[in-house]
Every structure is written in structure tokens, then in C-alpha cells.
Amino acid sequence: MRYKSLLQIILIVSCFLFTTIGFGCSNNDQSGKANECFDDPDLPLVEKSASGDSDLSGVSIDLVTYDAFLPPEGAFESFTAETGIQVNLLQSADTGTMVSQSVLTSGDPVADVMFGIDNTFLCRGLTNDIFHPYIPSTIEQLSSELLLDPYHRVTPVDYGDICVNYWIDEVAEEPSTITQLTSSKYEGQFVTQNPETSAPGMGFLLATIAYFGEDGWQDFWKDLRENDVGIESGWTESYYGDFIAGGGDRAIVTSYLTSPIAEFIYAPEPLETPPTAVIADSCFRSVEFVGILRGTDQPLASAMLVDFLTSTYFQELL
């Protein structure tokens, strides 16, 4: 199965999960809408050529993203110097919250561009028509495998792996497989995120479905609950709240494949090795997208920001 096809299946499954846990995939909350992820939105493309001579100096646009996103230092200042467009960063609690707020304000958005909706929440965004189609000038530089939406409502901007992390010195025995999370050895040690509001949380849920299958994943989650799993609303709350990295008392957390390296690089004192590691079979590939929010008053400036965020210059800064 080609990677693009697999990602599209993940979108459908994610949307179905939202309907089954109470989050509809369309404005009227009908559970049969999962197959509408890639329906024609019947909206015209944003065309930069139509206003190519416009002077955008002094224009200000809002970029909404999740709270853990840290823009590369000086990146937006560079964009402003080049275009005259000022970028204001609005940070939501987590991906799920960001998407939910955008669904509620679809057509009259609180921001102009969204950065960070991923493949676990994308179906919900697409079926609720929160994006305006736009083909970025950088499209030829992007991987065709990640161009999931044939109508170009979103553009891939980043990808990585969601994985269960553990603090090496704080577990009785280093876990090597996802099945061990229900062992009494790790009772009260694991914290993850609510899949209704958090992209890492949804990614971990989908990883368990992939691992245990449709007949086994619910039993696994039942066992997790009996083993005192912690559930937080978002990544920040779990990683810097419950997890040892933030002063908490839980030694296992859903985070990212790159988290051990980050712990190593940003440690207050030099380390010889990272203090954390990942459980390899818990990982789930997350693809993040950027898109122009439908109803923006600044479609041209928003399109230029999408071009910038998907440019080689910005990508090398990430």
C-alpha cells in the first residue's frame, strides 16, 4: 500500500473515531460524514495573480497554531522585511482545541492562517470547510506523498513521529513494547493525552488500534485504565505537568521521537546521554499542514505566508 493511501485511510479512521466518541465530522454531527474528507469544497482557489500589484506593507495577519509550536528565531521578522506583512502568532491549547474553535468560527475565523493541523484532525477540518483552497508557489518542492487533499485546502509543512517516551532512571525496567504499559510494573506511571483535544493523544490512540487491531484495542485501553493511566488535555500539561521532565511523578508519557534529543540538548547541565528513550512500536507518523482559513479578510497576504512557511528557507529553520 502506498504511503499516501495509508495516510488517507488514517484520515477516514480519525474522523470515524470523532463521531463514535461524540465529536462529529460535520456541522450537523451525522456519523456518515467520514467519507466526505475529500469532497469537492466548491470554492475558488486563492489567486495571487489577481492582486499581484497590491502593496501589502503594513498589513497584519494572524497565524493560529498549537501552544507547543516555537517559531524559529527571526523567521517572521524575515518574512515581514521581505513582504511588509506583519504576522501575529495566536496559540491555542492544543491541536484538537484549535480545530474545534476553527470549526465553530468557520467562515468568520479568528485568524487568517492555521499552522499545525495534522493528519489525525485533518478530516474534521476538511469536512467542516474551515479552509480556503490555495496552490502554493512551492508545490513542486513538496513530497507528492504528503499532498493528501486533491483540492489543495491544506499544504504539508512538517512531519514527525509521536511515540511513548520514558525516563530511563525512573522506571523499574525499561519497557520495550507497548503491551508492557498495562503491566503492574508501570502502574500509575503512564500519562497520555485526551484524543478528543490532543494530536499526540489521538496519534497514540491510532497507534494502539494499528497494533492491537479493531478487536483488541478497546481491551488494551480498559487495561490501561485499570493500571491508573493519566489523561491530560494536551501535550504541555502532560509533559511539563505529570511527567518527570516538568517535575511530575510519572515516568512514561506520550510525546515525540525527537523528545529524547531535545532533553539532551536543552538539559540545564551537560549530559553524556539522553535521559529519556522511546518505545519503538508505539510510534505513529504525524504530518502537519498549513492552510488559509475560509473567510479571511487577507487572502493574498495569507497566501504569501503559506508560501513562506513551505519554502526551503523556513523548512531549513525548523
Give a label for each model feature:
Residues 64-67, 131-140, 150, 152-156, 166-168, 179-182, 257, ...:
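Short beta-strand->loop
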Residues 188-197, 308-318:
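Periplasmic-binding protein-like
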Residues 52, 109-114, 132-164, 179, ...:
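A structural signal for short loop-to-beta-strand junctions that line the ligand-binding cleft
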Residues 207-282:
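Ligand-binding pocket segment of bilobal, Venus flytrap-like solute-binding proteins
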Residues 32-124:
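Early extracytoplasmic/lumenal segment of secretory-pathway proteins
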Residues 26-28:
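Bacterial signal peptide processing site
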